[in-house]
Amino acid sequence: MDNIILRCDNNINGIFTAIYDAFVYKNQMQKENHEVYRDNISIEIGIGGNYTLFSKMIDIETDEVKVQKTILTIQKKLGFKIYETVFDALCHYSDNRATIVLGFLVRAFKVGQRIMEYMTDKYVMEVFELSRKVNKEADKIRGFIRFSDNGNYLLAHFEPKCDMIPVVMWHFVDRYPGENFVIYDDRRRYAVVHPRLKECFYINESEFCLLYTSDAADDKA
């Protein structure tokens, strides 16, 4: 079988899309070659990676339908607890996290929830280790994040090692359901916005700067 590298956007939805496509290519390769899959599909996160000799590089476009199908399949076949472990592992900063999770899911879909008994497998062990480290940092962050009153909303800045916004934001949604608040990740340059009593949404750096500038202008008016 040829080696395939799937290159995806550097965010959780980009990775879930790549995982979906990885299984499509895996099944196609097995059907065409009648061979056992040998972990020869990897996922590269972000732009600017190095091409590998004798490997096929495929750029993956983030697809919300594929994202939801992947999430629902993991939850249905493996349970919500294992889904949370996978999600947390994907929020780690390791460049290999997507490939590690792919290897884990290939094995998990074969044995179901019994995958937790296979801790000697390197992919299983690494997924749980990544998840553990993310949760350790999340526990610290929940305790030290502080909001400042920005007039129209509460604002918090932080610079975590791991991608913490998707992990910790629900803690603050539960804590401040009636508040407008924004949490901005200075390292990854994006934010989550929580309008009071409404659903959260993400904004990028330019959108955050526009929000911040607009709010500052309102204060001066």
Label each region the model flagged:
Residues 30-33, 180-184, 206-210:
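Glycine-rich loops and low-complexity Gly/Arg-rich segments
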Residues 62, 199-208:
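Acidic, Ser/Thr-rich peripheral helices and adjacent loops at domain boundaries
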